[in-house]
């Protein structure tokens, strides 16, 4: 049987997989990107793999940013994305559930597998908001060739259909 606690490190530490994700991020540099993962270390790794010229266009937020100064940084990162000063916001799934309202977002990257309907729907909702001049939002869902991951994809696919997404 598959042990989930071993699967996530296997996926998040896979260099080829991470290079594919970063390739998608670089290809979408003109968009406003929300990158979600279960692991803060994974988000840090993806961010570090971006070309240096894109680093100033990134911010990372997570639910552990609870001290006064960390909370201020989190609020500033969200405001920077709202205003368009940054193009990449790296966040934990947990934080994305906490009413992250940035209508400008138009690209979503689900970098670790999720099956929970509420989490998937809330994540999609982050890019579904209307914003002047915003094109069709796109969600990148990375499905690994592992039975467990494929089964979770089937559940997410159902969530996407219920949310009115085009697959």
Predicted features, each with a name:
Residues 90-91, 98-113, 121-122, 137-142:
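A short beta-strand element within the Helicase C-terminal
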Residues 1, 152, 159-166:
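Conserved P-loop NTPase
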Residues 55-56, 103-107, 132-139, 163-165:
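Short glycine-/polar-rich loops that comprise or flank the Walker A/P-loop
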Residues 34, 44-45, 54-97:
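Conserved helicase ATPase core of P-loop NTP-dependent helicases/translocases
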Residues 40-42, 95-97, 113-117, 128-129, ...:
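Conserved nucleotide-binding/hydrolysis micro-motifs of P-loop NTPases
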Residues 18-19, 71, 93, 117-121, ...:
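Amphipathic alpha-helical transducer elements in NTP-driven molecular machines
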Residues 126-159:
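Conserved segment of the helicase C-terminal RecA-like domain
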Residues 1-51:
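Conserved interdomain hinge at the start of the Helicase C-terminal
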């Amino acid at each position: 049987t598959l042990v989930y606690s071993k699967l996530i490190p296997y996926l998040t530490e896979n260099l080829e997989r991470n290079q594919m994700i970063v390739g998608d991020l670089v290809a979408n540099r003109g968009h406003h990107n929300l990158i979600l993962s279960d692991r803060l270390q994974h988000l840090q790794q993806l961010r570090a793999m971006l070309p240096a010229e894109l680093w100033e266009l990134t911010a990372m937020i997570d639910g552990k940013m609870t001290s006064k100064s960390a909370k201020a940084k989190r609020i500033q990162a969200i405001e920077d994305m709202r205003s368009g000063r940054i193009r990449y916001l790296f966040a934990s799934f947990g934080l994305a559930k906490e009413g992250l309202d940035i209508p400008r977002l138009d690209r979503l990257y689900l970098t670790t597998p999720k099956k929970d309907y509420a989490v998937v729907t809330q994540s999609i909702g982050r890019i579904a908001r209307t914003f002047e001049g915003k094109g069709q939002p796109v969600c990148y869902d990375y499905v690994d060739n592992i039975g467990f991951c494929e089964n979770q994809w089937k559940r997410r696919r159902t969530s996407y259909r219920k949310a009115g997404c085009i697959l």
